Each structure stands twice: as structure tokens, then as C-alpha cells.
């Protein structure tokens, strides 16, 4: 079995299997042991944990996970990586299940039920940057029982997840993530920690899921419609953003009245509102729609 974690071993494995990186899968393998160890520490993995790894690649981080967790479920979309994982890099571990599937099509709740009795799991991943948001939001919206999600993402995306009102990075993603979890940037990771090197900076972010939502809202679906509409046309006022949104078909007068009841100026932009204010606005509009 090849023990991974530095460029030399990674290259040996790739050459042995004549592996070719596929751009469509956003493959950038981690080759820095310090970063790998930091991810494991940040996720606070113990021998009691079931860990879901998304996109194990050649199994570099999976090896660390197998040595620290009770059980690992690794979901890999690229069929060309499965022989490497099963026959080589993970062959000596008996606590890992490899699933060759698109993570967006996997019933993770069923896995949690079968393998962890429905108790919260931990999610660890070096995520493909082109589908970071769909993966994370998919986990949230499916209400998968999760303790924390510790993932490598594009630096710009990590900044957006952690940003607050009024900052240039604050947006719909910030609010959505913060509704479900408490984000914390663990480390910034330069391109030379990957093979091949990405063209952007990266960051490890830990999302610790809230046991209870930080705000109470009667209509969660409406809340997220309002948030998306407010940032679709970022430079417009909140009122114009909501009035122009195809998702929200409400009379202009109703929107104006709701903003007035919220107690903010009529010219305010969505980027100035907190999560609490969006929740209050959703409740006001929900009441008016009845």
C-alpha cells in the first residue's frame, strides 16, 4: 500500500496507474502533510465518528481519516480512481466504504441511518471548486445530521461564507451558510500545496452546524427567496431587488409596506440587512400574504 502525503508518493501512484487529471471533475490533489493534519485536527475527529469524505481522489486524506475515525464513507465520482483506492492506497483499511457516484445523487441521510443510527456525522473534503456551493447547500437543505463540515474551498468562497453585512463579500451564500452553521476559516492554503496547482488561492473552512437555527422564521422557503432576490441585483435598493425578482410576485405596495414595517429606510440595499432582519422581513411578508 502506498502511504501518501507528499509529491513523490503522489507522482508514483499516478504514474503507476497512468492516471490523467480530468478538468471536468476539478481535480487538485493535496500534497502537503501539514495541511492534511490541520484539517484532521480542525474536524476534531475521534474513534467514535463516522466521516463522510467527498472526492477522496487517490486517497491521501482518506488514509488520515481511516486512522482517526471509526468509519469512513468516501464518495468518488471518477471511476478511474476506484481501482487506485480499492487495490492500492486504501487496501489495508477495513473501516472505509468507497462509493463510485456523484455526491449530489447520493442519499446521505440513508447512509447516516444505516451506518450511524441517524446520529450526527462529520464531513471532510477537498471539494471540487466548481460545485462547492451545490454540495454544501445540498447537505444543509437535506437536513443531514452533521456535527461539522471541514472542507477545502476557494479562498474567495470561504471569505463569502464568513462575511457580515456591509462587506464586499457579503451575499446570499453568507446568509445561507450562517443560517445553518457557524463558519470559521481555519487556514489559507497556497497553490503549491496541490497537484496540479490551482489558479486560485484556497482555504480550509469549518462549518459547525447550529443545533437550533440562529433566527426563528415562519416560512424558510420565503426567507431564502428574499435573500436571493436581494443580491441578484446587488447595486439596486432592497425594494427594487424584490420588485424585479421573478421568484417574488408581490404587489409593490406590499413590499414597500413590509420594508417600512421592518423599520429601515426605503432606500436601503439588501447587503445592509442582517440575517435577523431578513427573517423579520420574511415574517412580515408571510403575514401579509395570508
Swiss-Prot record:
One of its GO terms (cellular component) is cytosol. InterPro entries: KsgA/Erm, rRNA_Ade_diMease-like_C, rRNA_Ade_Mease_Trfase_CS, rRNA_Ade_methylase_Trfase_N, rRNA_adenine_dimethylase, SAM-dependent_MTases_sf. One of its GO terms (molecular function) is RNA binding. Transmembrane segments: none annotated. The keyword Methyltransferase applies. S-adenosyl-L-methionine binds at residues 28, 30, 55, 76, 102, 126. This is Ribosomal RNA small subunit methyltransferase A. It comes from Lachnoclostridium phytofermentans (strain ATCC 700394 / DSM 18823 / ISDg) (Clostridium phytofermentans). The gene is rsmA.
Amino acid at each position: 500500500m502506498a502511504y501518501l502525503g507528499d509529491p513523490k508518493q503522489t507522482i508514483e501512484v499516478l504514474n503507476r496507474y497512468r492516471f490523467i487529471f480530468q478538468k471536468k471533475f476539478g481535480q487538485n490533489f493535496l500534497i502537503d502533510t501539514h495541511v492534511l493534519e490541520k484539517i484532521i485536527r480542525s474536524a476534531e475527529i475521534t474513534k467514535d465518528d463516522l466521516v463522510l469524505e467527498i472526492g477522496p481522489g487517490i486517497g491521501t486524506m482518506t488514509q488520515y481519516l481511516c486512522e482517526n475515525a471509526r468509519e469512513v464513507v468516501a464518495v468518488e465520482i471518477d471511476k478511474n480512481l476506484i481501482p487506485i483506492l480499492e487495490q492500492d492506497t486504501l487496501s489495508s483499511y477495513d473501516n472505509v466504504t468507497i462509493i463510485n457516484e456523484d455526491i449530489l445523487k447520493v442519499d446521505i441521510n440513508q447512509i447516516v441511518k444505516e451506518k450511524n443510527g441517524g446520529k450526527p456525522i462529520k464531513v471532510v473534503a477537498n471539494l471540487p471548486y466548481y460545485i462547492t456551493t451545490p454540495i454544501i447547500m445540498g447537505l444543509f437543505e437535506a437536513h443531514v445530521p452533521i456535527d461539522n463540515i471541514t472542507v477545502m474551498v476557494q479562498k474567495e468562497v470561504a471569505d463569502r461564507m464568513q462575511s457580515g453585512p456591509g462587506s464586499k463579500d457579503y451575499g446570499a451564500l453568507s446568509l445561507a451558510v450562517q443560517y445553518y452553521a457557524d463558519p470559521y476559516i481555519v487556514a489559507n492554503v497556497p497553490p503549491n500545496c496541490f497537484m496540479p496547482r490551482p489558479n486560485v488561492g484556497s482555504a480550509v473552512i469549518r462549518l459547525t452546524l447550529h443545533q437550533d437555527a440562529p433566527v426563528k422564521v415562519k416560512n424558510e422557503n420565503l426567507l431564502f427567496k428574499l435573500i436571493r432576490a436581494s443580491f441578484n441585483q446587488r447595486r439596486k435598493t432592497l425594494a427594487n431587488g424584490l420588485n424585479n425578482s421573478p421568484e417574488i410576485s408581490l404587489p409593490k405596495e406590499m413590499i414597500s409596506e413590509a420594508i417600512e414595517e421592518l423599520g429601515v429606510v426605503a432606500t436601503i440595499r439588501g447587503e445592509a440587512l442582517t440575517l435577523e432582519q431578513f427573517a423579520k422581513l420574511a415574517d412580515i411578508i408571510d403575514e401579509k400574504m395570508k
